[in-house]
């Protein structure tokens, strides 16, 4: 059996010009000095057990039982799977311990009967988790959740301008409605079962394009076990709809066993408990979107407060807030962000992440980012006891000029140097766990990257990424480099094109 690592790149040519009833809530002030002690991560989980079954293939393939490997499990952990049929005794299914995977195929399952599966450590009588698989569940391989259609804005007569079909829009002239795009899962209420938070919006604007459609970006939480609606957060008119504008994170940030939601907000954001951010800056206005159709920034938001809000997973209420990375002086936008006040494209490129910068066993930090085409800033914050505390703030200006223009549309987080603390791969550069620059390859901006153990013959992790500008990447339009040092391992010429996509896959050949 031979294993072949394949790197695939795609050359894609891109052109970019590069109320009276308000309940006003205030946000905490962030101290400059972070707390030294962080709470240990608490895990309350039933292993996320799941049984997958394909009714089309039927019993030929059996049922696949899968579960999560937990961070406290020993490296040599081995498991047993037991099954009870129609309330009978539990019988072990595997003939030898399951020690190389976290799944097991039950080839003998009878889908006409109720099957209850238990996961145990090999040789143990104590259940780590269980899952009930019924004949009704076997009838389909997916679960339907009905979206909450109540209290949505009236969009009657609004049609799609047809500029963003690639983001899931249906094209020019199509009626506009609230469609689901991104989603994230997490245990919002601490019961050991996952919930899902979905983003709904009427249109996905690219920051390069001016324009306006009615509607605002919504984040909604649903239970996965029964599809019950939990809460809705309406980001409001000052957070423009679009993939680049509203990334969000669902993660247990304070180690209490319940996941929070972190997202960029502004005045007029409405939370799940009905609270609305009011006129926080006292300027007498709460609506900042440019509504001048003749402006190059029509439909964009270039003024007004911006925040990072932490939202309770159970209620959807805001529990902490701080200022987002500021836009800065408008006169400096062109030189710093790469475009001006009347365009507002590169300034409004946002990313978010989570990293364990203290240790892998401590509560994580939330990471907010702004910019990547030219200068950019990254801030890591810790959330504990209802407060946000700044851990570090990275800025390419003035000390990291070799990091300018090195960001991607995406990032990756992992312990790349083996110190037990996470680093951030930010396109063609890396930021250390302490917020200091680790390295920059200088190969420039790109649209895709992957962090992983791609070369088993080398120590540590590798990064596979593609790049946009031939003047930057030279002979390395697609390349793999050492994640800890930035050393180029090998590269592929881009033939003078924008290499818009890349992928890594492992193929097995006989």
Features from the language model and the residues they span:
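Short, conserved, GDST-rich strand-edge loop motifs in beta-rich repeat architectures
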Residues: 199-215, 264-302, 468-471
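Conserved small/polar residues in nucleotide/adenosyl-binding loops
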Residues: 508-509
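Recognizes extended acidic, P/S/T-rich segments that occur
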Residues: 68-69, 73-113
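Repeat-based blade/solenoid architectures
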Residues: 152-162, 171-182, 236-247, 328-334, ...
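Bacterial Sec-dependent N-terminal signal peptides
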Residues: 15-40
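Acidic carboxylate motifs that coordinate Ca2+ or other divalent cations, activating on Asp/Glu
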Residues: 191, 256, 283, 419
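Beta-strand-rich modules
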Residues: 109-124
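Extracellular fibronectin type III
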Residues: 124-141
């Amino acid at each position: 059996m031979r294993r072949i690592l394949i790197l695939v790149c795609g050359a894609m040519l891109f052109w970019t010009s590069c109320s009276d009833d308000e309940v006003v809530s205030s946000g905490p002030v962030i101290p400059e000095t972070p707390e030294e002690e962080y709470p240990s991560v608490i895990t309350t989980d039933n292993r996320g057990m799941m049984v997958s079954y394909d009714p089309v293939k039927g019993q030929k393939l059996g049922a696949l039982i899968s579960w999560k490997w937990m961070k406290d499990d020993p490296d040599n952990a081995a498991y047993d799977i037991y099954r009870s049929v129609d309330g009978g005794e539990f019988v072990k299914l595997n003939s030898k311990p399951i020690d190389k995977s976290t799944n097991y195929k039950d080839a003998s399952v009878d889908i006409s009967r109720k099957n209850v599966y238990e996961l145990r450590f090999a040789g143990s009588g104590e259940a780590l988790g269980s899952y009930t698989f019924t004949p009704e569940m076997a009838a389909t391989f997916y679960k339907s959740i009905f979206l909450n259609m109540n209290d949505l804005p009236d969009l009657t007569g609004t049609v799609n301008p047809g500029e963003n079909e690639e983001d899931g829009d249906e094209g020019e002239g199509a009626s506009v409605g609230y469609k689901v795009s991104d989603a994230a899962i997490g245990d919002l209420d601490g019961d050991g079962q996952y919930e899902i938070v979905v983003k709904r919006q009427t249109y996905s604007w690219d920051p390069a394009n001016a324009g306006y459609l009615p509607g605002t970006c919504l984040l909604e939480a649903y239970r996965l076990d029964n599809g019950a609606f939990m809460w809705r957060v309406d980001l409001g008119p000052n957070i423009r709809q679009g993939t680049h504008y509203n990334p969000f994170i669902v993660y247990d940030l304070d180690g209490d066993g319940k996941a929070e939601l972190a997202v960029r907000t502004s005045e007029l954001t409405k939370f799940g408990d009905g609270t609305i951010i009011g006129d926080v800056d006292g300027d007498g206005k709460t609506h900042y979107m440019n509504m001048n159709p003749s402006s190059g920034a029509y439909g964009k938001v270039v003024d007004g407060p911006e925040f990072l809000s932490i939202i309770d997973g159970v209620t959807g209420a805001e529990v902490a807030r701080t200022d987002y990375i500021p836009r800065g002086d408008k006169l400096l936008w062109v030189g710093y962000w790469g475009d001006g006040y009347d365009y507002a494209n590169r300034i409004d490129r946002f990313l978010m992440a989570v990293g364990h910068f203290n240790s892998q066993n401590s509560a994580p930090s939330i990471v907010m980012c702004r910019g990547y085409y030219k200068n950019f800033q990254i801030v890591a914050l810790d959330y504990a006891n209802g407060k946000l505390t700044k851990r570090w703030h990275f800025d390419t200006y003035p000390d990291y000029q070799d990091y300018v223009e090195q960001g991607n549309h995406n990032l990756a987080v992992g312990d790349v140097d083996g110190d037990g603390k996470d680093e951030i791969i930010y396109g063609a550069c890396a930021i250390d766990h302490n917020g200091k620059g680790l390295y920059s390859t200088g190969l420039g901006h790109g649209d895709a990257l992957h962090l992983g153990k791609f070369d088993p013959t080398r120590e540590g992790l590798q990064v596979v990424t593609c790049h946009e500008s031939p003047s930057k990447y030279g002979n390395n339009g697609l390349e793999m480099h050492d994640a800890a040092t930035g050393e180029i391992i090998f590269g592929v010429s881009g033939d003078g094109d924008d290499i818009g996509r890349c992928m890594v896959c492992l193929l097995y050949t006989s």
